[in-house]
Amino acid sequence: MFKDINNYVKQNYVVKQIDNKIQVNYTKLLLMGEIDFIEKWPKDDTETIVEIKCVNSINIKYYMQLLLYNFCYYCTRPNSKYSLYRNSFKIINLLTGIEYIFSVSVTPGNMFTILNTLAKVGGLTFSGMNLVYDLETTGAIENQGPFEHKPVIQRSQIYFRNNKYYAIIYPEIIEIAIKDYETGLIIMNKLVKANSTLTLGIQNITGITPNMLVGQSTLDQIKVELEDKLKLFTACNMLAHNGNSFDNKIMLFYKLLNPQQVFFIDTLSVIPVHMESNSKLDKKNLSAIYYQLFKEKFQAHRAMNDVDALIKIMKYLKIEF
């Protein structure tokens, strides 16, 4: 087999630079494999992952294998111009003499589904993931009280202090986005159906209207889906901007996360210490930090937009976890 590969390469790859038998892995899921070779054209700065097969026919499993090789190879090369999720590939079938040249692409959300399915089938776990997330809600967290008698209030935590009752009232979630910091894998990006009416103020801030929430998943459905997606995660970091004061509290109140399974990191505390010594933050909200660093605005207060902005800020500051 290897003699056939070497002969093929010698006869057909005179100009290209060939790297063969490249070991690839994705350590956070313990995925590993070996690419037969990568053909490179230094002049054009292009490269193609090539697989050698000796089979009767090329089917979907070989395309899937290449997609996984591509992900594992380029996730360790974050500065590469090549994408984790789409690329051109080549399969050489020595049995038939046919060379297949094709492109494969997958969304970051579907790529996570593929990896999660592999984890379930193979008994693997995602370890040490850094998930950036954001919530859009129907309002702020409110504190009410004191009350002489224990009140009954929806979406609230009641506590007793100094012979009085107090209530912490939580808003409803109307959008949730979760993305892996290193690879951009999308774990969730969904609108959430609310039971209460969206105020005009919230509609103006977020751009989310009541019509957009019609037919969307309920919070209970989101909880089931998120539980299924994260059940194979261990030692996971959940990163949110101002998370300790807002997002983390809401996630825990609605029991969307298991506090024994995750560790919360508030980037409001992380970002300032990574600024250059001669540069201080004018303001600490996400939009202000983004504008200070990039001199442009982004469409804030949509969950995935906020997540992407936060990731861009942290990568610009070379923050690692």
From Swiss-Prot:
Keyword terms, alphabetized: Exonuclease, Hydrolase, Nuclease
Paired cysteines (S-S): none
EC class (word): hydrolase
SUPFAM superfamilies from the UniProt entry: Ribonuclease H-like
Documented EC number(s): 3.1.-.-
PANTHER family found in the cross-reference section: DNA POLYMERASE III SUBUNIT EPSILON, PROTEIN NEN2
Protein name: Uncharacterized exonuclease R569
Organism in which the protein naturally occurs: Acanthamoeba polyphaga mimivirus (APMV)
